[in-house]
């Protein structure tokens, strides 16, 4: 099991792209999916951060209203599916709101010991046609417990879905996500990133460390960055060499 990506919900995608580029990240335009559109910050270790926003500010207000009057809570009680998770994204606060694990067999994941008592939503297949004509296909399932991760399984090569090449080179030297601290105990474990339960964080909160090759440190946080909490840190392997 691997960490695939983190979801960062923002109020305005163009603003988010500009602000993260100002911090030295290369941001790659994504696409549209229903009422949302996205962009990606892709790293050399096959992890990425997805910046996602509603295309319409009116839709954002409508989603918040539905949440406020309890319609979404009622839907969540009546039906646990992937759509409920997406509605939570679109109606909730900005920031790092979810994490996705990558597996090769989601049916086996659903019956693994850490998740057998939680259960997964029914699988949903996705398909996207790239401008170069390639067809990208993948399947998503989510843990029934909202603050647990959702899962992706690729039906086509991973580099069809996650861009490769120069888009993974960042002026700030970012190499990849190395640690995610969570306000809730997350299961199952992954082998490519350290997932740490931090009881000082609010349930559902995420704090991310990204290692870089420039021996630099930075803390990206606050309202200007959509209440996210990202730490840019030196690569410990480089420090060991010195």
Give the location of each predicted region.
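Short glycine-biased active-site loop of nucleotidyltransferases that positions the nucleotide triphosphate
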Residues: 32, 39-43
